Amino acid sequence: ISGRIRLEELHYAAQHNEYEEADDVYQSFGDVAKEEGFMEVASAFYQIAKIEKIHGDRFGKLAELLKTGAYFECQEGEKWMCLNCGHIHSGLKVPGVCPVCRHERGYFIPVSLAPYLMECE
């Protein structure tokens, strides 16, 4: 797509930023707090650094899934949820558009990744 940033590129950029926060920002905050004798504060910053690393890992995984096209396909039957209207679609692939609200396939996520997991029939 000429002149447009691809979604996976944004996720790779987000991964980079999360790793930077983990390795530089919160790690250094923790080091300063530790040097100044604030051990509890230092511990909190070190824990936040670990969380930021996990965020980076997740952005990277999502970028790879988008890049390969695997995000919108699966080997076994999957249930997909439209984040706009809540429609649940069953199948190996996400439809091009939601049959209910007509939003693009990018609004679908696997039900297993939905913010509030509910039993689907």
Regions from the PLM with identified roles:
Residues 1-121:
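Non-heme di-metal
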